[in-house]
């Protein structure tokens, strides 16, 4: 239920250039230690905000009932006060009172497959190659680019990011390389080898469902050049031509409990265990995909976004993955490329910073051809497939096929304007887009719904995310007034501006640690830890409605013309991600086909219309020049 974790909004960040590229030992620790600790907000403040957030999404009777429960919860000396004190004690003892709980509840205890339900896919711009040579050359350059970024992490010279003048926690950058999720029966874990005594020097390459260990550093510690990597990729490609191999990787796409059982039988065999260890330890994974069926240009982006998110099923590339791996870059022969990442380790922005760096790097011309030195043959990772494992693979194939058939995903490139228009109106582009989403949803369904937009808590040490609730009394007043003929246009403009400003104010509160969602989660988990009976406010209908996010959304801004995508977090909801560029906006919209009420193409259409109608409204009523 908590897979909504992920979706992180961060405004474009200012970067501090490192003063030198020498190893700055201890610089990372000093930076991290100086960050403020995540506060526990005052109890009454969070409960007031909770009641306010319920108004647009529950009935008056439900709200009145919840108000009673909230009043009981916060009586002097009552259960709320006791739990609040417990949280405050926890905050004094820990580096971050939330991060460990959040990692467990949002990710590691989440039992649905990571594919679609948790791990975001990233669709990158189509490259201009159309053959094997081009595919391998680009993959080699991409690998070189990631290693270039890794050197900044290793040397602690990564530019510190800022948000609103405040330095941000950089810890997630140290979690995304040489790391992997490991399935467990009730709870998964994450292993990270970046800081181990002997950090890994290899990556994993997958082709035709076959896994290889490719060393990307020479014995003297210098990285291979893209020319040298290209030669190694050719060797891998040539030694994995047979396409009838069992797709062991598809096991990682299954329900976490099923995968945990299959995993324990898989690694009983020493050969398998060593192969799995190699994948888990590798710096990252590169998937050399086979071409997908040709489709018309207008559905191409949606089709390829699916490849990045889930691999297209067992007949295509879903077996050409190890979905537990934190970073998997995907390069196909037809020029399509992207990535998929396992969400437990990090939110979108650090991933996007890496992607931006790598995509810039791939455009650099090769100035000198590097000398061709003899390089060892990349090591093929062997798997011994027992009948039991073969059976597990068959089940995983069937399951992913059902999941993919159920996913309705639509890419929309909104060409009419980008960040430029809201900025010209002195409005926040993110808030403008969120209010357009509210308008689109209201026009389809005639009501508001619980809406999740992630806010970054990286101003705080080890901060992850909190929730911006985009459905507000102000947004509801606007969406009702927008199509009401009795409301004059000038008043609609005022309602629109008020709604956008209210969203902006909520965002500012959230990034300063003053939103209520994670606080309520903390109180609930504190109750479980203290073995007290679950307080009534968490057993209430309003709470269930508030946590049923029909719109799960995320702004993930990038310099690269790309977009992230993920599945809805509820069966009757939408997953919406967007990257606002200067003059256009990239959207991905997902829904489930099994829900008759939701439809990704219809939502995309209504979203486009909402954005255009809001622009027209503002253009017809220009603000007086001050």
Swiss-Prot record:
Query: Which is an annotated GO molecular function term of this record?
Result: carnitine O-octanoyltransferase activity
Summarize tissue expression.
Answer: Expressed in flagella of epididymal sperm.
Where in the sequence is N6-succinyllysine found? 93, 261
Q: Could you say which enzyme class this protein belongs to? A: transferase
Query: Which terms are listed as keywords in the entry?
Result: Acetylation, Acyltransferase, Endoplasmic reticulum, Fatty acid metabolism, Lipid metabolism, Membrane, Mitochondrion, Mitochondrion inner membrane, Peroxisome, Transferase, Transport
Q: Which Gene3D superfamilies match?
A: Chloramphenicol acetyltransferase-like domain (3.30.559.10), Choline/Carnitine o-acyltransferase, domain 2 (3.30.559.70)
Disulfide-bonded cysteine pairs: these are none
Which residues of the sequence carry a binding annotation for (R)-carnitine?
A: 452, 454, 465
Give the function comment from the record: Catalyzes the reversible transfer of acyl groups from carnitine to coenzyme A (CoA) and regulates the acyl-CoA/CoA ratio. Also plays a crucial role in the transport of fatty acids for beta-oxidation. Responsible for the synthesis of short- and branched-chain acylcarnitines. Active towards some branched-chain amino acid oxidation pathway (BCAAO) intermediates. Trans-2-enoyl-CoAs and 2-methylacyl-CoAs are poor substrates.
Q: What is this protein called?
A: Carnitine O-acetyltransferase
Q: What is the lineage of its organism?
A: Eukaryota, Metazoa, Chordata, Craniata, Vertebrata
